[in-house]
Amino acid sequence: MSYGIIIQSRFSSSRLPGKALLKIKNKEMVLRQIQRLQHFIDIPIVLATSTDVTDDPIADLCKKHKIKCYRGPLNNLVQRLIDCAKSHKFKYIIRVGGDDPLIDPECCAKLKIENEKEKQDFIYASCREGWPYGCAAELISLNSLTRILSNTNDSFYLEHTIPYYFDNYKDFKIKKLPSPKNINRPNYYFSVDYEEDFKLINKIFEHFLPHKEFFDMKEIVNFIDNNKELLHINSNLHNGFTR
């Protein structure tokens, strides 16, 4: 059975344009994300961006570093995921946001393990299940994506994908993946939406990079637990967030 990690990333962003290519210690954020996943788990990775000219720099970065890249519609993410999965013969997708440089590779591995126990259309890990925000992912079956594409032409669902599963949960086999207790920190926000978020991510990398390039989620959580003042960097932007 074929699994693949698809990282969705695009250059355009109303809040922080070009964030995928912002550099963390002289290396692009999305490149650090990909190399982080490659270091910890052995699942094929493809970066899915759009055919829009604004995303040429992302495609160029992939080419430079020999990273698999697929380009599809800018605003129809469902179609982009389907076409990307088909082109790489993935039956199940582990979807990762390009805004999440501290994605937990163990979460991705656990999603695959859970699906091997009993096949699902959609398995989600989120801050509602205890994961730090920006560290979790979702597993999606290719079959369920094709059903969504057939059943709706609503631009909101086609662009954002995940809400369709929750709004039509009776039509799918859905399972949730709780976080391990030792990293259960749903109030920690590690996704990059604003400049302040990027500043926090930089602080975390600055702590580890002098002596360790790759660090796991438990190490990140322990560092923040012992330096909670860092949470103030972006806390005013994400009060009461849910996902």
Label the model's feature ranges.
Residues 51-116:
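Short phosphate-binding loop-to-helix
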